[in-house]
A protein has these predicted regions:
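Active-site/ligand-binding surface loops and adjacent short beta/alpha elements
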Residues: 182-185, 189-259
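Beta-strand-rich N-terminal accessory domains
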Residues: 23, 27-100, 104-107, 250-259
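Short solvent-exposed loop/turn micro-motifs enriched in small/polar/acidic residues
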Residues: 32-35, 89-91, 111-116, 143-147, ...
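Hydrophobic residues positioned within well-ordered beta-strands of beta-sheet architectures
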Residues: 40, 128-130, 148-150, 161, ...
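N-terminal amphipathic/basic-hydrophobic helices that include classical n-h-c signal peptides
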Residues: 1-37
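Acidic, contiguous internal or C-terminal segments within carbohydrate-active enzymes
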Residues: 134-181, 187-188
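Extended, loop-rich substrate-binding clefts of extracytoplasmic carbohydrate-active enzymes
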Residues: 104-156
Length: 259
């Protein structure tokens, strides 16, 4: 129903100190399809962050002391994105379609917000907000009025990613929203990811489902348990052979890439 939902993700880049004044700017560039794009910059003495207006997508987080990049550089040979926001669907629908109000609608994986130009609404020294509004084209795929707001706030060695979904209509707004950040790993120039892993705060074991690579649909009958050592699971040669690890429920509130 009419109203709004607010969510926040916190990315922390550790072992960084001596933070002072933040400032913001922007520059214009042409993408690989010769499309005119805007990239906005948030910067302090420690981090430099870049966000595209297209998809309001986080594209770069660099440690300024040594120009170390934390984010995946969107090599299209493997995966041509860096950190798309998934809206109004997370994942795939069966046959890439769904029914609502007696009608069938076609929609691609992860919705459409990541593939649309967002409007920069406000910008301060340390914070920037973008917005995306429903229009005639989105209504063809998703028959709901909405306002999606995506914000980024730079504070010390942390980048806060904020979402706000507003419903300007009186009918219930059905949606899902998700993050899809990709981080550089290995981080220090190693030849493999062995020795790196994930830490799930407060957990002794992790329960997850898998999915089918050809459709992306979850295999809900599959319940896999990963034992954790000191809250961690380390990457093995076959760790990423599985398409996706689907972790349901509020098992933890913090996941870290560790080495």
């Amino acid at each position: 129903r009419s109203g709004s939902v607010f969510s926040l993700i916190l990315l922390t880049f550790r072992n960084i100190h001596n933070v002072k004044l933040s400032f913001a700017n922007a520059y214009r560039y042409l993408d690989d399809k010769e499309k005119d794009c805007m990239r906005y910059v948030l910067e302090n003495d420690t981090l430099r962050v870049e966000i595209d207006s297209f998809g309001a997508e986080l594209k770069s987080v660099k440690r300024k002391s040594d120009d170390k990049e934390y984010m995946w550089y969107a090599d299209k040979k493997y995966w041509g994105r860096t950190s798309p926001v998934l809206f109004p669907f997370v994942g795939n629908c069966r046959n890439k379609e769904y029914r609502y109000g007696g009608k069938t609608y076609a929609i691609g994986q992860h919705g459409f917000a990541r593939d649309m130009e967002h409007t920069m609404e406000s910008q301060t020294e340390d914070t920037i907000w973008f917005s995306l509004h429903s229009d005639e084209e989105t209504m063809k795929k998703y028959p709901f009025a909405f306002v999606l707001k995506i914000g980024y706030k730079l504070a010390d060695n942390e980048l806060k990613v904020m979402w706000k979904v507003e419903n300007p209509d009186t009918k219930t707004l059905y949606f899902s929203i998700g993050a899809h950040p990709a981080f550089l790993c290995p981080f220090n120039g190693e030849e493999s990811k062995l020795g790196y892993g994930l830490q799930f705060a407060g957990l002794k074991e992790l329960h997850h489902h898998g999915n089918t690579p050809d459709t992306g649909l979850a295999v809900m009958s599959e319940d896999i348990v990963i034992p954790l050592e000191d809250e961690k699971v380390y990457f093995t040669p076959g760790f990423f052979d599985r398409c996706t690890y689907m972790v349901e429920g509020k098992q933890t509130g913090e996941v870290s890439l560790v080495t």
